[in-house]
Amino acid sequence: WIMGHMVNAIEQVDEFLNLGANAIEFDIDFDKDGIAQITHHGIPCDCGRKCTKKAIFTEYLDNIRQVTTPDDPKFREQLVLLALDLKLQRISSAKAYRAGEDVAKKLLDHYWQRGNSRARAYILLNIPSVEDYEFIRAFKDTLKNEGYESYNDKVGINFTGNEDLDKIRDVLEILGIHKQVWQADGITSCFARGTERLKEALEKRDTPGYNYINKVYAWTLVRKSIMRRSLRLGVDGVMSNNPDRVIKVLKEKEFADKFRLATYNDNPWEKFRG
């Protein structure tokens, strides 16, 4: 999976897909009451990027629904995964449950259209900290209460704050989540980061019977040397400001026979068995 990073303006969706991304990440900004308002990162952000692009969240969902719906004029077959980077760190942790309710309802109304949409992308909920786990509880409660619990099959969980992996496991255990879990490891493209935690996540992913990590990705990679390093370690995905660079690296002799771009037929919740 090649995730286009910080795709917050509607016009950026095609831009990143044209560069080779098959997944996009966008930031969701909330008001003080936990209501999702806009797709927006804000300052500071990655080096060399404009941090202020944005869209109204519901309008963004309406557009991305079309982009991921077969036979729609806007349909782009390659886009199979949407990563929602939830800016919960900007609101009170007491509002995390309200935020989870709101995002679930907006996805129901504007993306899935309560069963009337054929939009098919998988959804990854990127949570900044284990302290915000009530968002996940609320999201799942809302799908159940609204009568659309089946959409849980399309939704995965990912904690992005580089926290202790055992602490993340404990929170997932509290929530009763034993599947559909991704694990991110990374840092803004402005800085270098070692591989110790990334290696630990990959080791846990590959441990038989360990159900708290199905996929691992590294972020935000812009240098080809770091992309190569991550691929050699065996990541499932790369988040990048430059998907075209990832494409070029994947075509190199070292990687061409080992990796390919994920398609809709690849289940993002299953561990890869090479």
From Swiss-Prot:
Enzyme Commission designation: 4.6.1.-
Free-text remark on how the cofactor is bound: Binds 1 Mg(2+) ion per subunit.
Residues noted as binding Mg(2+) in the record, renumbered to the chain: 25, 27, 85
UniProt note on tissues of expression: Expressed by the venom gland.
Cofactor: Mg(2+)
Active site: 5, 41 (nucleophile)
Keyword 4Fe-4S in annotation: no
Major site of localization recorded for this protein: secreted
Keywords: Cytolysis, Dermonecrotic toxin, Disulfide bond, Hemolysis, Lipid degradation, Lipid metabolism, Lyase, Magnesium, Metal-binding, Secreted, Toxin
SUPFAM superfamilies for this protein: PLC-like phosphodiesterases
GO cellular component: extracellular region
GO BP terms, alphabetized: killing of cells of another organism; lipid catabolic process
Disulfide-linked positions: 45-51, 47-190
Catalytic activity: an N-(acyl)-sphingosylphosphocholine = an N-(acyl)-sphingosyl-1,3-cyclic phosphate + choline; an N-(acyl)-sphingosylphosphoethanolamine = an N-(acyl)-sphingosyl-1,3-cyclic phosphate + ethanolamine; a 1-acyl-sn-glycero-3-phosphocholine = a 1-acyl-sn-glycero-2,3-cyclic phosphate + choline; a 1-acyl-sn-glycero-3-phosphoethanolamine = a 1-acyl-sn-glycero-2,3-cyclic phosphate + ethanolamine
Enzyme class: lyase
Role this protein plays: Dermonecrotic toxins cleave the phosphodiester linkage between the phosphate and headgroup of certain phospholipids (sphingolipid and lysolipid substrates), forming an alcohol (often choline) and a cyclic phosphate. This toxin acts on sphingomyelin (SM). It may also act on ceramide phosphoethanolamine (CPE), lysophosphatidylcholine (LPC) and lysophosphatidylethanolamine (LPE), but not on lysophosphatidylserine (LPS), and lysophosphatidylglycerol (LPG). It acts by transphosphatidylation, releasing exclusively cyclic phosphate products as second products.
Family: Belongs to the arthropod phospholipase D family. Class II subfamily.
Name this polypeptide is given: Dermonecrotic toxin SdSicTox-betaIIB1bii
